[in-house]
Amino acid sequence: MSNQSDKSRPAADQLMAKYGSEAFQHAPSMTRSRLEERLAQGDALDQHFIKTFVDFAAGMERRRVLDKRTRWLVQIGQFTATRSSGHLEDTLRAAIAGGVPVREALESILLCQIYAGDTAVAPAVDVFTRVARDLGVLAELRKDQLPLDGHDRERSLEAERKSWKPDEENHPAREALMQKYGWLGVSTGIKYRGAHHLNLLAHREALDSEWAGLWLKFTYQNMYSRWVLDDKTRVICTVGDTFAVGDFVQAHDHIIEALHLGIAPREIMEVVFLIGPYFGSPKMAASLKVLEGILGKQGRVAEIGNPPPVK
């Protein structure tokens, strides 16, 4: 928060006149009051810089490649994964005020347990709890919690098996893995990663079978089977998280998953572009290179404009 006193800070109408209405119409992942604080702080320190940043960030907010809900949920996850508590608070307040369901905002934070761990999620939960209490929405989270066993009791192996492809059904390791670890995590993995999941689980089982079981249950039976967010939103948030932390190996796999789920290349590219204002050009450029490489292999570069190679 800015340390400027209210008396010394320019009025909102003065800030709007100086920096333009665009920033106020498309506040960059923050509430209007917080934008006024940021502008006033920047106005006192370096007016050219704050205008340069706000014009860039507000310009990204103005774009409509992603709907507001998706963009906010992606950014909530990114600011969680990168331990950016100030930006996380700003975005949570803007998102909840803008109509994002509180449960979905929390879920974007909790999913970061997979790729950023508890050292990122625990402080983010503290921020979320404070914001939710301030906004009077904390109590409603008691009403729609999952039971302790999640969706396990509702699931049917017979029903899920019908969606398996021949290479998944006939995979030489599948039956033994299901016998050893149960079918729930294996089936969720098949749903999202296909035969690759079975290959990965077989590899990890050979490394350490006990650890592989713990990993499978945590990641696939539990976290990826929560289904608080729809699959497309969850996966595009995961792509955003991996971009933000610079995990381009996992980003590669989840981009392929996103494309398989029907997420458009331009939607994924928009997540790449959003990296720029908040996490810098190096991560944005690396993320774009990964995406273009995948689209090239799939013969889909035309869907992002057939850009000429950079020499």
Where are these regions (language model features)?
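Amphipathic alpha-helical segments within well-ordered protein domains
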Residues: 57-61, 75, 92-96, 109-110, ...
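Short, structured motif recognition centered on aromatic/hydrophobic residues
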Residues: 71-79, 106-109, 233-242, 271-275
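Extended intrinsically disordered, low-complexity coil regions enriched in Ser, Thr, Gly, Ala
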Residues: 86-98, 103, 122-129, 248-267, ...
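Acidic, glycine/proline-rich low-complexity segments that act as flexible tails and inter-domain linkers
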Residues: 1-68, 121-231, 260, 284-311
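Short acidic alpha-helix initiation/capping motifs at coil-to-helix transition points
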Residues: 48-54, 81-89, 213-216, 245-251
